[in-house]
């Protein structure tokens, strides 16, 4: 008879794909999978997520002790309420009492997280930084940012800390997708890069932008804006390390060393300038889902293990 596994689940929900991970009580990854979001939620969000997880629990003869699910969204301090998900094909009805509905379906506790905290959790564990103060800047579609403090993602008084992309250091003639004027993401994000790229015909694909146009004034301005924002966060938090990643930084020929040098120019001397470390984030389809599973393991399996005979 196949041994039953005690596991937790991590889900990273994006607009295009849902990534899913099972992690055992021993802290090992049991299974990772990627599916198209539209296909998973076609029968309904709760039914689709429930069936996706239950299918793998049956396959591996596993019992799930908890789920952490990440969204590109604002998540309340209670870790059960989704405040805003502008980039997901979900309605208010889909999100209403979602944690309770998933718990009833899966018969295990459920918590939500902002997706950037999932990536942070993976990067911190992978780089053995769990006992340190760590900042992470993920330059992708937007400007993602997260803080690791006291052994966990720091989310602030109301659960929405870390919105570096929405500090008012952007283009004051533009309104951000969040509704506010002049957010950093208006001129420092993948969205801003795409707008610039599409202003006129280019003889190279967007993904090769840094190969051909690193020295273009707009691109240099974007790097400068990113450096100032990251340096500001370092001067405020005095971290041990800063993780740099995201889809834009993963593009070919992205000038990572230039960005670090620009950032260091604005750091307070002698500290934190002399001691802060810059670490490249790993790039994988499943980092977010594995980060969610790590958080679930920390949150739910210690309780189970304490009760186990």
Swiss-Prot record:
The keyword Transferase applies. GO terms for biological process: D-allose catabolic process. Keywords: ATP-binding, Carbohydrate metabolism, Kinase, Nucleotide-binding, Transferase. The keyword Coiled coil does not apply. It comes from the Bacteria. Pathway: Carbohydrate degradation; D-allose degradation. It is an enzyme of class 2 (transferase). ATP binds at residues 10-17, 142-149. Pfam families: ROK (PF00480). InterPro entries: AlsK, ATPase_NBD, ROK, ROK_cs. Its EC number is 2.7.1.55. GO terms for molecular function: ATP binding; D-allose kinase activity; glucokinase activity; hexokinase activity. It catalyses: D-allose + ATP = D-allose 6-phosphate + ADP + H(+). Belongs to the ROK (NagC/XylR) family. Catalyzes the phosphorylation of D-allose to D-allose 6-phosphate. Also has low level glucokinase activity in vitro. This is D-allose kinase. It comes from Escherichia coli (strain K12). The lineage of its organism: Bacteria, Pseudomonadati, Pseudomonadota, Gammaproteobacteria, Enterobacterales. The gene is alsK.
């Amino acid at each position: 008879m196949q041994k039953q596994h005690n596991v937790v689940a991590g889900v990273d929900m994006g607009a295009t794909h849902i990534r899913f991970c099972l992690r055992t009580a021993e802290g090992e990854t049991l299974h990772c999978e990627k599916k198209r979001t539209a296909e998973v939620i076609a029968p309904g969000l709760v039914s689709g997520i429930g069936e996706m997880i239950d299918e793998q629990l049956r396959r591996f003869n596993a019992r799930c002790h908890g789920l952490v699910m990440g969204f590109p969204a604002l998540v309340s301090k209670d870790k059960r309420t989704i405040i805003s998900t502008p980039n997901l094909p979900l309605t208010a009805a889909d999100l209403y009492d979602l944690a309770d509905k998933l718990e009833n379906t899966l018969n295990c506790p459920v918590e939500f997280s902002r997706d950037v905290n999932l990536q942070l959790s993976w990067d911190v564990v992978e780089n053995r930084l769990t006992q340190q103060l760590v900042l992470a800047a993920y330059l992708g579609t937007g400007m993602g940012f997260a803080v690791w403090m006291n052994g966990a993602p720091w989310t602030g008084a109301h659960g929405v800390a870390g919105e570096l992309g929405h500090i008012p250091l952007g283009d004051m003639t533009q309104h951000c997708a969040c509704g506010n004027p002049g957010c950093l993401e208006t001129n420092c994000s993948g969205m801003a890069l795409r707008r610039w790229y599409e202003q006129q015909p280019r003889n190279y694909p967007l993904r090769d932008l840094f190969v051909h146009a690193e020295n273009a004034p707009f691109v240099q301005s974007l790097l400068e804006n990113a450096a100032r924002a990251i340096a500001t966060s370092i001067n405020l938090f005095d971290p041990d390390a800063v993780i740099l990643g995201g889809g834009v930084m993963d593009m070919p020929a992205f000038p990572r060393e230039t960005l670090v040098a620009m950032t260091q120019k604005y750091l307070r001397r002698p500290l934190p300038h002399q001691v802060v470390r810059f670490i490249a984030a790993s790039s994988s389809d499943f980092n977010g889902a594995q980060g969610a599973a790590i958080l679930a393991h920390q949150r739910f399996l210690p309780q189970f293990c304490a009760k186990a005979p």
